[in-house]
A protein has these predicted regions:
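C-terminal segment of classical bacterial N-terminal signal peptides
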Residues: 14-24
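Soluble metallo-hydrolase cores and metallopeptidase-like ectodomains found primarily
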Residues: 30-33, 113, 119-152, 219-321, ...
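Second-shell loop/turn segments in exported
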Residues: 31-39, 55-65, 127, 131, ...
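Catalytic-core environment of secreted peptidases
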Residues: 38-57, 62-85, 161-166, 171-175, ...
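Noncatalytic luminal/extracellular "stalk/propeptide" segments of secretory-pathway proteins
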Residues: 58-161, 168, 279
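Metal-dependent peptidase/peptidase-like ectodomains
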Residues: 118, 222-246, 343, 353-457
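Extracellular/luminal Protease-associated
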Residues: 119-225, 287, 317-320, 423-424
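His/Asp/Glu-rich mid-to-C-terminal helical/loop segments that flank catalytic regions of hydrolases
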Residues: 337, 341, 346, 457-505
Length: 505
């Protein structure tokens, strides 16, 4: 995955022409700064943000009236810019069915030698894939992290309730928690429970976050039942089975660990309220001269936010999401206007995703059923939370060092009179944004922005107005840097849209 950046190679440093397939760079005695034709203005971005993040749009929650207004606005703006609907039938709206689950009740009893194991009160959270599940006399196994350093399931879990640690293992290139859970479930476990404790998140947060989830079919748990058991309850279960907790936790990291079977059996009941939320991605397209055989490029950003996020009686109930991510959608609209003026060599797709705030779900849904084969996407650029810093900031590549695109992006950055931020600090957020859903499938996907060049400034936003009602339209939103980044994305689109500037090899 860590590919070295390559040089510009065939990038022609010739005179700039209006056609997108013409070489990008202008000949000059001082070629460091490229003249920007029709630069994006702060006011243009502000107008879109003021609409998308207005109270009328109710925080842009998926499946709400706010969604209907939001996706209609985006599609209309792209159509006005000259884009075509990006679906195979020419449509704009790609359905995404979100599965909302609410743990409505349940019980988990461990029986050891005919006696119930006494557990602390309110120490277990249970959820099921189906509305109701009843399982009796399940064998119980502690399976450590679930898998070993090679990703192989360590214990015999078939037909059993498997307990695995939630914390990340310190060995090997082990997959994430979801992957570990699903590996155990696919090995035949009837139920999978995480052991939690000692983490920063208090129990009430676990109950809220884990007990109420939204996903898509491909991201559902492979386990019929899964849940969380608090560490003090797990310790009581270990003790009832005469297993030394500290010793067994230490054994977990050893290569030879193969789990331990308990003498206890488990009786489990779970009730889950399930409903489907009908949502949509929006897909637009600038048709290229050469078609998909020469590859396509993509710009994406999420349109959704948190909707009505405060209870009745609160002074402000709406999380408007002005910076996150009305600002990104505003940039997508303005970039589309400029890129559509001249036909590129390659198709350029614009994707506005739903349910990013629920776990990148719209992006994952697109990756599951893409409108263009993923291996045809030669470059994808996600735009998110782009109105954080003023103009003049360095340009960070979130995902630097993971694709062959870096050198060209750095050259484009310098051509606009800006400096690349070559550090890797921003890469800590690679898997927290929509581009990750594509990157995980092999697509060269990046974020390019000044907003991620100074992590202190970004954290000031994340620790302040982020996901709060205060993230709303107003003069305090910094748009000078966003306008600069919008111009940068136009230049990126022209460059990678050209098979002369970017052959794609």
């Amino acid at each position: 995955m860590r590919l070295k950046a390559i040089g510009l190679g065939a990038v022609a440093l010739a005179s700039m022409a209006p056609s997108l397939c013409s070489p990008l760079w202008a000949q000059s005695a001082s070629p460091a700064k490229l003249a920007i034709e029709n630069p994006v203005s702060e006011e243009a971005l502000r107008q879109h943000i003021n609409i998308l993040a207005s109270d009328e749009f109710e925080g842009r929650g998926p499946g709400t009236a706010g969604e209907t207004k939001t996706i209609g606005y985006i599609a209309q703006q792209w159509a006005n810019a000259g884009l075509k609907g990006g679906l195979a039938d020419g449509g704009w709206y790609d359905p995404v069915n979100l599965i909302e689950s609410h743990a409505a009740g349940g019980s988990l009893r461990f029986i050891n030698k005919g006696k119930a194991v006494k557990l602390p009160e309110d120490s277990i959270i249970i959820r099921s894939r189906d509305a109701a599940v009843h399982l009796k006399k399940l064998p119980v196994v502690y399976a450590g992290f679930g898998v070993d350093a090679n990703g192989k399931v360590v214990a015999d879990v078939a037909g059993k309730l498997a307990l695995i640690r939630m914390d990340d293992p310190a060995f090997g290139d082990v997959k994430d928690l979801r992957s570990r859970r699903d590996a155990v479930a696919k090995a035949g476990a009837a139920a999978v429970f995480y052991i939690v404790g000692g983490e920063k998140a208090p129990w009430d947060i676990y109950k809220r976050v884990y007990g109420e989830t939204t996903t898509i079919p491909s991201r559902q748990s492979a386990a019929a039942v899964d849940g969380i058991i608090r560490r003090d309850a797990a310790q009581a279960l270990f003790a009832a089975n005469k297993v030394d907790w500290d010793k067994m936790i230490a054994e977990t990291v050893k290569p030879e660990f193969t789990g331990i079977a308990f003498t206890s059996k488990a009786d489990l009941d779970a009730t889950t309220h399930i409903r489907t939320i009908k949502s949509h991605n929006v897909v637009g397209k600038i048709p290229g001269k050469l078609g998909a055989d020469k590859g396509v490029i993509m710009f994406l950003g999420h349109w959704d936010h948190l909707g009505i996020c405060r209870p009745e009686g609160a002074a402000d109930r709406i999380c408007n999401g002005a910076v996150d991510n009305a600002s990104g959608i505003a940039v997508l609209i303005e970039a589309a206007k400029r890129l559509a003026k001249n036909q590129p060599d390659r198709d350029i797709y614009f994707l506005a995703t739903t349910a990013e705030e629920m776990g990148l779900l719209g992006a994952y849904a697109f990756a599951d059923k893409p409108v263009v084969p993923l291996d045809k996407i030669v470059a994808a650029f996600n735009i998110d939370t782009i109105a954080v810093v003023p103009k003049g900031e360095k340009v960070a590549i979130l995902g630097r060092g993971t694709t062959t695109l870096d050198a060209d992006i750095d050259a484009i950055t310098r051509s606009l009179g800006r400096e690349p931020e070559t550090g890797l600090d921003s890469n800590v957020m690679v898997n927290r944004q929509d581009g990750w859903a594509l990157k995980a499938r092999g697509v060269p996907a990046l974020m390019v922005s000044g907003s991620f060049a100074d992590m202190k400034k970004l954290m000031a936003y994340l620790e302040g107005d982020y996901h709060q009602p205060e993230d709303q339209p107003g003069d305090k939103i910094i748009l000078s840097g966003a306008a600069e980044d919008a111009d940068l994305h136009v230049a990126i689109g022209k460059h990678f849209g050209s098979v002369t500037a970017w052959p794609g090899t």
